[in-house]
Each structure stands twice: as structure tokens, then as C-alpha cells.
């Protein structure tokens, strides 16, 4: 290939370059590889003369030979004279577009449809566009490239990064729109056409539902109403719950056998319990809830009877009934959020639960509900279920990305989005409401408070709240009394607020970035069929932001990875601790024959049964013959949901008469303890280092830096803190403080306040609430084991447990 062009500022000269290789990637050409030739008009034609390579002159005839030897390309614009020169020698040519910025660096790069962008009046390559933006904005190259490939315009990208109020330019912030698929065009079944009892039809129609949604229709076609086991995969909020209800209530009416509905989180179980109670008690069915109800705070009156027709529960709540052999007469099992199989630790427990349900209730219909995953066929085969795969969305989803300079800017954008959404009333008569996800409970509380101070009706919602408070927030949102709810990323699977808009204030969950499954779940919460015409998602991204030092990527880099991520495969593989727990749980459920234990259809088993049984026998939890017998110790461990090796640690502490606080700290330390932010900032300046946020780490830094602290009051305060923890295990001491404050009658909020006021220790009421709930479960387990090995120890544990649960 030959490229012929006019060099800049040379009126009567052409440049000829021979290019080999992939010119779309850019080829560097040195000056000594270029041929220059002058031209002049003689009569009505042009002639070449004074030709050279560098400083060396060559004959015009040699240049003509070269021009005739290969295909010639010239630039499209302002090259009329070159065209005339080539025509004078009867030379044929085509046109080519080169990046003008690359040419300035002696790089010849062809512009194609995919590698170009606009900059002012010029067309340049994506790489040069990236460099121009990097000159003005500090941002990752990958991030810029994604935007340039989308907008094809440097100025537009710069506008997006600099815009004062991005909400005024939705065409700039909009990343994409996810709409329906071919499946959305199918003819949906009318409710009256379904093979279900008339009373169920009336209940459904009373909710304003006259016909099924696409995924529901596909499920009916796949055998939902014929008792077939199904794995149903579709986006969040696409109508999966009703699928379970159709099968469960139909089977209940026809056979009288129980309908089980399993969910991963207490918050979601509470919501489903109240919904089913309202809907189906009018048919004469009893609905009960099986979850670990909160024991800290006000007690809640809910139905928990096992004689109920419909039982809603968390995975652990239902598994407890199986491990204690108290679950009978099951007709339908619906397991929601089955993609939770991917979760560390919890995935193994869910897999074990599913295996036991499949083995014990072979005749029951199993419906597995999942968000989008990467290996649906494989999972359906493993579950021995028919696959129903729906890729559409009942409501289109707009995804926007907005750049924010700092947390303050994020807060202002959130306020503006919430206000605009609230003013927007859908054709169905609903105001727009927002669901805001952030990385921690503390942050959720802070944002809700900050938004309230700006006149927004906002509430926080997280797992550390008492049931009654959570329920009030749910009701207020459903009744459109509040404009937005701020919740944690960790609760994304358990939040079912009918929001028009989802705002991701952060792309982190705790100390880690969101994974694609979590991100997709959050996005799926935006837009509800019959309430909103469209759902919106806003990613608020701070360029270069990391929430923890261990994070490898920055928030801007993570944003594009999440937006472009493909669904993750669901994979389950037990480690030894997990397999020991699941085999012990199976034996506890009454499956005691070796052959039967081996036939329980787990997905994740990785060890031989003989090895696991041998381990359990060595702990004294079973007696392994052909028919395996569970010991009292094994039973206590199984119903306590403990790893057997952890139970061994507890047993050892009980036998040694170890102090209860010491034993608890070894098994389950309270780790969410921080130095107050004001003190951290002050000390970091004085000591000229970044003082750690975690209290345990910061205390050591304070001890070593005391000599540098000259402020008398500060030194006195720090000395008191150091003396309080001198010569003791800090974790034990803090746990002892928390327990003593609780026993004295303080609420989690009051405990947090006392620790701050007296020791500048920052804790959060939600974390303390959650920890005390988990602590009571651990004390239950410890008491069970102690009843076998040390009854006096058991009494001490029982006494402590009662004091924590029912303080003065």
C-alpha cells in the first residue's frame, strides 16, 4: 500500500510512504523511509521533479516505478492537486482516512468505523481522543475508552466529565437502555384461561392482574401447573414470586399439602409472610413465619406454627426444621434467589438444604427462582429441573453514569434525582420513588439523615433495625409517604421496594467491590410493571476512589466492568468444614443409612463419604456403622449450624472452664470497632502518618506516638484510653464492655453512644444489634454443648444469655 499526501506548508510537494502491516493499528514511519517529490504544471498536466529520500536525490522515473508497483491511497479532503498529479500519469487511486494527530507523530493510522471519534471539526482515532481527555481530566484510560467508543466524540465526553448538573443532560449520562426481548412478544395467558381453582383466580384478579407476564406464561407452558420441577431464570422484579404462588396454592387447594416459600434474608421473609397472610388467609389458609426472630429489642407477635398451610422462612429457618425432623406433608417448595448458591459459606448451606429437601420430599414440586446466571442449563441439570429462561424485562431500564468529585457532590446529585423523581407521576398514578444503595449501615444512616436535612422524606433500612421499624419503612414506602429509602448493598436480595429509580451511591459492599450478580440484582429493582413506564439506574462514580486500601481497582474502573459484565456461573464446591457440616445435618434430618446419605443429591460434594464420617466419628458426633447413629453432641452441633471443628473448639473451652467472654472472643470477636474520625484526623496530622481506622490497630500506633503529642488535654484523654486497655486483650475488653452495658439495660444505640463518649471508640448501633443477635445464637449452641460436657458451665451460659436477652 502506498499513501500519497501533501505535507503541511508545502504547496508544491507530495509525500509518498510505503506501508506494510495492519494500518488500522498504526504504523510508525521514519523520515528516511519517506519519499518527497516536487511537482509543477506543464501545459495542462503536472510533472514530478526534484525527488528525494531524506537528503539523497533520486530520479523521478524511479518514483513513477514505485507508484505503478502498488495500490495508491490519498486523503479525502483538500487533495485535489494530488489527484491531478496522479491523473497526469494515468495512475489509479482510492481514498483513505488517517488520524491527523497520529500523523503529527509520524504514525499512519487508518480510521475505521470502530476506532474513530470526533474532536471539534476533526476525526481522530480513539487513542488520540483518550490522550486529549487525559490532558484535562485525571481518569483511567479504560474508562475514557469505553465512553469514547460509545459517544465517538471527545468534546461530548469532556462535557460529561465537566457538566455542572448532569441531570439536565440525560442524553450524555445515559449509558444504555435495556428493553424487552422476543419473548416479550408472546401471547400471555389470561388468568381466566389458567388451570387453577376459581378462588385462586379471584385472589389474583383482585390484585389488578388480568393476565400473566411473559416469564409466568413461559413457566405455565413448561409444566408449572402440572407439578413439574422448574428452574426459572429471569431478571429481578420480572414476576417470579407469582409463579411460586400459582403452583403452591393450587397444590395446597387440591392436595392439602403444605406450601413452603424460602428466601435468603429475614427482611424478605417478613415481607412475603405479610403478603401471603393478607392474600390467602381469606381462603382459610394459615400462614406462618420461620426465621430467627429478633431477640434484642421489642418482641414481635407472628404466627410460627408448623401446622400452618403456608410456611415462609429463611433458608436457615426451614433447614432448622429439617435438621430437627419437624417438617412434614410438603406439597410445594419454592426456593427464591437460588443464585445464592454462589455465596461463600451460605452457598454450601443452601446446597445442603436443597439436597435434603429433594431426598426427603421426592413427590413435592420444587420451583427454583433465580436472577440471571451464566450456566442455566448446567444448573437445571444438576437440580433435575426443567429450565425456563427469560431474557426480557417487563419494564425498560435506563442505566446512567454520573461522575462526582466527592461525597458532597454525590449527596447533592442524590437530592436532585429524588426530587425530580417524586415530581414525576406515572400514567398509573404513582409518584417516582428512589432506592439508594450504599456500602455500610453507618453510611445508610448518615445519608438518610443528610437528605432529611435537605427537605427530602428519606429513611434508612438495614439488617440492624428492629423488625417493627423495618416494617414501618416498608409500609410508608408502599403507601408513598416517603420519597426514598437508603439501604445497604448487603440487603439487595432482601429489599422489595417498588422503586422507579435505583441510585448506587457506591459500587462497594463493605470492604469489597460489588460483583456482577449483586450489581444486576440492584439494577433489577428499578421499575415495576403496572406502576412505572420505565425504570432508571444511576451509578454515582467518584474518579480514582477506593474505599479500602486493599481494593485493586478504582470506582471508575469498576463501573464499566459492572456495566459490561456477563452473568456469573453458579458453582458450588465444598471445603472440608462445609462438607462435614452438611453430612452431619443430613444425619440429623433422619437420613442415617450410609447408602442413603451418599444418595442425597448435593451439587458441591468434594470428599469421600468414608473420610467425612471418619472425621465426625473422631469428634464423637456420630457412631458410624451401616446405620449411622447421631450422638447427643452431634445433634447439638447439627441444630446449632456450627462447623464441627468450631464445635470442637467450644467443647474444649467448656471442658477447660474457660471464661465465657474469652471463649466467645476466640470464636466470634466483635470486629466493627473504630477510632472516632475526628481523633483519627487529629492524630494523623500530629504523628504525620495515616492512623488506622480500626481501633485495635490504632491503639498500638497511639502507644508508640505518645511522646510526639504535646496537646495536654489530648494527651490526658489518650492516656485514659491506653490505661483502660493496658495489660488486657483489647478484643475481650471491648466485648466485656458491650455485654455489661447491655446487661445494665442499654439499647444498642445507647451502648454505641457510651463507648464513644467515654473512650472515643466509634461503633454503630446496627453492628452492635446484629452482633448481639448472633451472640445469643452462639450462646444457645454453647449451652447445648455444655449440657453434655459441663452442666455448671451450661447454667452460667444460660444466665448470661438471659441477662443479654432480657436486661434490667
Swiss-Prot record:
Entry superkingdom: Archaea
The UniProt record lists the keyword ATP-binding: yes
Residue span, Helicase C-terminal domain: 396-585
Principal EC category: hydrolase
Residue span, Helicase ATP-binding domain: 221-391
One function term, GO molecular function aspect: ATP binding
Gene3D superfamilies assigned: 1.10.3380.30, P-loop containing nucleotide triphosphate hydrolases
Any Pfam family: Helicase_C
Stored InterPro entries: DEAD/DEAH_box_helicase_dom, DUF5814, Hel308_SKI2-like, Helicase_ATP-bd, Helicase_C-like, P-loop_NTPase
EC number: 3.6.4.-
Positions with a binding annotation for ATP: 234-241
Keyword line: ATP-binding, Helicase, Hydrolase, Nucleotide-binding
Motif Q motif, chain ranges: 189-217
Protein name as catalogued: Probable ATP-dependent helicase MJ1401
Species, as recorded: Methanocaldococcus jannaschii (strain ATCC 43067 / DSM 2661 / JAL-1 / JCM 10045 / NBRC 100440) (Methanococcus jannaschii)
Amino acid at each position: 500500500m502506498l499513501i500519497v499526501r501533501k505535507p503541511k506548508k508545502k504547496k508544491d510537494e507530495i509525500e509518498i510512504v510505503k506501508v506494510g502491516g495492519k494500518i488500522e493499528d498504526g504504523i510508525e514511519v521514519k523520515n528516511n523511509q519517506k519519499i518527497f517529490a516536487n511537482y509543477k504544471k506543464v501545459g495542462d498536466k503536472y510533472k514530478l521533479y526534484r525527488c528525494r529520500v531524506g537528503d539523497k536525490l533520486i530520479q523521478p522515473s524511479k518514483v513513477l516505478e514505485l507508484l505503478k508497483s502498488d495500490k495508491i491511497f490519498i486523503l479525502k479532503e483538500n487533495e485535489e492537486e494530488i489527484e491531478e498529479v496522479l491523473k497526469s500519469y494515468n495512475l489509479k487511486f482510492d481514498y483513505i482516512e488517517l488520524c491527523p494527530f497520529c500523523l503529527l507523530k509520524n504514525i499512519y493510522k487508518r480510521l475505521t468505523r470502530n476506532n474513530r471519534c470526533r474532536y471539534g471539526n476533526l476525526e481522530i482515532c480513539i487513542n488520540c481522543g483518550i490522550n486529549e481527555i487525559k490532558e484535562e481530566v485525571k481518569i483511567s484510560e479504560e474508562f475514557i475508552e469505553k465512553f469514547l467508543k460509545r459517544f465517538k466524540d471527545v468534546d461530548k465526553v469532556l462535557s460529561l466529565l465537566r457538566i455542572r448538573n448532569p441531570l439536565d443532560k440525560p442524553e450524555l449520562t445515559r449509558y444504555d437502555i435495556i428493553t424487552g426481548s422476543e419473548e416479550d412478544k408472546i401471547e400471555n395467558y389470561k388468568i381466566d384461561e389458567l388451570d387453577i381453582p376459581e378462588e385462586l383466580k379471584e385472589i389474583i384478579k383482585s390484585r389488578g392482574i388480568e393476565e400473566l407476564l411473559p416469564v409466568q406464561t413461559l413457566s405455565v407452558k413448561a409444566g408449572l401447573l402440572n407439578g413439574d420441577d422448574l428452574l426459572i431464570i429471569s431478571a429481578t422484579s420480572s414476576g417470579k414470586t407469582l409463579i411460586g404462588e400459582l403452583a403452591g396454592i393450587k397444590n395446597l387447594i387440591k392436595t392439602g399439602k403444605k406450601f413452603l416459600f424460602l428466601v435468603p434474608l429475614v427482611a424478605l421473609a417478613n415481607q412475603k409472610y405479610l403478603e401471603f397472610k393478607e392474600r390467602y388467609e381469606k381462603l382459610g389458609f394459615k400462614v406462618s413465619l420461620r426465621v430467627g426472630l429478633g431477640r434484642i429489642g421489642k418482641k414481635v407477635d407472628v404466627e410460627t406454627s408448623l401446622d400452618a398451610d403456608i410456611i415462609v422462612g429463611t433458608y436457615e429457618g426451614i433447614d432448622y426444621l429439617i435438621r430437627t425432623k419437624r417438617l412434614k406433608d410438603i406439597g410445594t417448595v419454592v426456593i427464591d434467589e437460588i443464585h445464592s448458591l454462589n455465596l461463600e459459606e451460605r452457598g454450601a448451606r443452601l446446597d445442603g438444604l436443597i439436597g435434603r429437601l429433594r431426598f426427603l420430599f421426592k413427590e413435592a414440586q420444587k420451583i427454583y427462582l433465580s436472577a440471571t446466571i451464566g450456566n442455566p442449563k448446567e444448573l437445571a441439570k444438576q437440580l433435575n429441573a426443567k429450565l425456563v429462561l427469560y431474557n426480557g424485562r417487563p419494564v425498560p431500564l435506563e442505566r446512567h453514569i454520573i461522575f462526582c468529585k466527592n461525597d458532597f457532590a454525590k449527596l447533592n446529585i442524590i437530592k436532585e434525582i429524588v426530587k425530580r423523581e417524586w415530581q414525576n407521576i406515572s400514567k398509573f398514578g404513582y409518584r417516582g420513588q428512589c432506592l439508594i444503595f450504599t456500602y455500610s449501615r453507618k453510611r445508610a444512616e448518615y445519608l438518610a439523615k443528610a437528605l432529611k436535612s435537605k427537605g427530602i422524606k428519606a429513611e434508612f433500612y438495614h439488617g440492624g433495625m428492629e423488625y417493627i421499624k423495618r416494617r414501618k419503612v416498608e409500609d410508608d414506602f408502599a403507601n408513598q409517604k416517603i420519597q426514598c429509602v437508603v439501604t445497604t448493598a448487603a440487603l439487595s436480595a432482601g429489599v422489595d421496594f417498588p422503586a422507579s429509580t435505583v441510585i448506587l451511591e457506591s459500587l462497594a459492599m463493605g470492604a469489597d467491590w460489588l460483583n456482577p450478580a449483586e450489581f444486576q440484582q440492584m439494577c433489577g429493582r428499578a421499575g415495576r410493571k403496572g406502576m412505572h413506564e420505565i425504570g432508571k439506574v444511576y451509578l454515582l462514580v467518584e474518579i480514582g476512589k477506593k474505599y479500602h486500601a486493599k481494593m485493586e481497582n478504582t470506582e471508575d474502573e469498576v463501573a464499566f466492568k459492572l456495566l459490561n459484565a456477563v452473568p456469573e456461573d453458579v458453582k458450588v464446591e465444598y471445603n472440608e468444614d462445609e462438607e462435614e457440616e452438611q453430612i452431619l445435618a443430613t444425619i440429623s434430618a433422619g437420613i442415617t443409612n450410609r447408602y442413603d446419605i451418599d444418595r442425597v443429591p448435593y451439587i458441591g460434594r468434594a470428599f469421600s463419604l468414608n473420610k467425612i464420617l471418619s472425621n465426625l466419628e473422631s469428634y464423637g458426633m456420630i457412631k458410624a456403622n451401616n446405620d449411622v447413629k447421631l450422638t447427643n453432641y452431634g445433634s447439638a452441633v447439627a441444630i446449632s449450624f456450627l462447623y464441627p471443628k468450631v464445635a470442637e473448639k467450644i467443647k474444649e473451652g467448656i471442658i477447660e472452664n474457660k471464661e465465657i467472654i474469652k471463649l466467645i472472643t476466640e470464636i466470634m470477636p466483635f470486629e466493627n470497632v473504630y477510632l472516632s474520625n475526628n481523633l483519627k484526623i487529629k492524630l494523623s496530622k500530629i504523628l504525620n502518618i495515616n492512623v488506622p481506622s480500626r481501633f485495635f490497630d490504632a491503639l498500638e500506633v497511639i502507644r508508640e506516638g505518645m511522646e510526639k503529642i504535646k496537646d495536654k488535654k489530648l494527651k490526658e484523654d489518650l492516656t485514659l484510653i491506653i490505661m483502660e486497655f493496658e495489660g488486657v486483650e483489647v478484643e475481650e475488653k471491648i466485648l466485656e464492655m458491650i455485654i455489661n452495658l447491655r446487661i445494665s439495660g442499654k439499647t444498642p444505640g445507647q451502648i454505641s453512644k457510651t463507648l464513644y463518649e467515654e473512650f472515643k471508640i466509634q461503633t454503630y448501633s446496627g453492628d452492635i444489634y446484629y452482633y448481639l443477635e448472633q451472640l445469643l445464637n452462639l450462646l444457645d449452641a454453647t449451652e447445648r454443648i455444655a449440657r453434655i460436657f459441663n452442666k455448671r458451665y451450661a447454667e452460667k451460659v444460660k444466665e448470661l444469655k438471659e441477662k443479654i436477652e432480657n436486661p434490667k
